[in-house]
Amino acid sequence: MTQTAMSPAEFERALRAKGAYYHIHHPFQVAMYEGRSTREQIRGWVANRFYYQVNIPLKDAAILANCPDREVRREWVQRILDHDGGPGEEGGIEAWLRLGEAVGLDREQLLSQELVLPGVRFAVDAYVNFARRASWQEAAGSSLTELFAPTIHQSRLDTWPRHYPWIEAGGYDYFRRRLKEARRDVEHGLRITLAHFATREAQARMLEILQFKLDILWSMLDAMSMAYELDRPPYHTVTHERVWHRGTIL
């Protein structure tokens, strides 16, 4: 027997309920906003999240490439400009580089991606590859972890300056700009998702896709926790060198 589709309001509530699994609840994140993280842990997080930041425009470009709807493309392309920047405008990637400098990382070291852990790289690459293979509607819906993003950005702005006075204030610009951008992106992404996933089967699939994205964010922090909290980076039993691949073979 076919189940009745959720109403748009019910479906939105189901999507928002996934916030219970957002990475704001990961112990590594909790430690950061409670002021228990070391400088090495903060720097490790910034360096690894940079790989996520530079891949977001690739994810969004994949969505645009698969989308035949001009009106959707006109609105979605703003996400790429937000990260890459436009004429005379600094983008989010540049803002993240300044965050890296604010926590004491070398800009060239960030750009080299030499600190990116394999587990983080695999998780981010899985997200980009999903966006390339999936329908544009499914890939757009996977971005709805942004429903929960303003809370995590605000928590950093509220707690990090107090707990980590050694971080230069200019580094927080990325989080401030994303507060506004994420809310705008959520409105568009939610509109697409509620319009295109109208059967119970499609809604169930979209909820599973959103869980997939949550799994990616959580898995990234699992890799960082192993390396920076438990002092068990890859190959720690045989070497202290960062011997893992840098993505250049893929």
From Swiss-Prot:
The keyword Oxidoreductase applies. SUPFAM superfamilies: Heme oxygenase-like. This is Pyrroloquinoline-quinone synthase. The keyword Oxidoreductase applies. Its EC number is 1.3.3.11. It holds the Pfam family TENA_THI-4. It is an enzyme of class 1 (oxidoreductase). Ring cyclization and eight-electron oxidation of 3a-(2-amino-2-carboxyethyl)-4,5-dioxo-4,5,6,7,8,9-hexahydroquinoline-7,9-dicarboxylic-acid to PQQ. It catalyses: 6-(2-amino-2-carboxyethyl)-7,8-dioxo-1,2,3,4,7,8-hexahydroquinoline-2,4-dicarboxylate + 3 O2 = pyrroloquinoline quinone + 2 H2O2 + 2 H2O + H(+). Pathway: Cofactor biosynthesis; pyrroloquinoline quinone biosynthesis. InterPro entries: Haem_Oase-like_multi-hlx, PqqC, PqqC-like, Thiaminase-2/PQQC. One of its GO terms (molecular function) is pyrroloquinoline-quinone synthase activity. Belongs to the PqqC family. Keywords: Oxidoreductase, PQQ biosynthesis. GO terms for biological process: pyrroloquinoline quinone biosynthetic process; sulfur compound metabolic process.
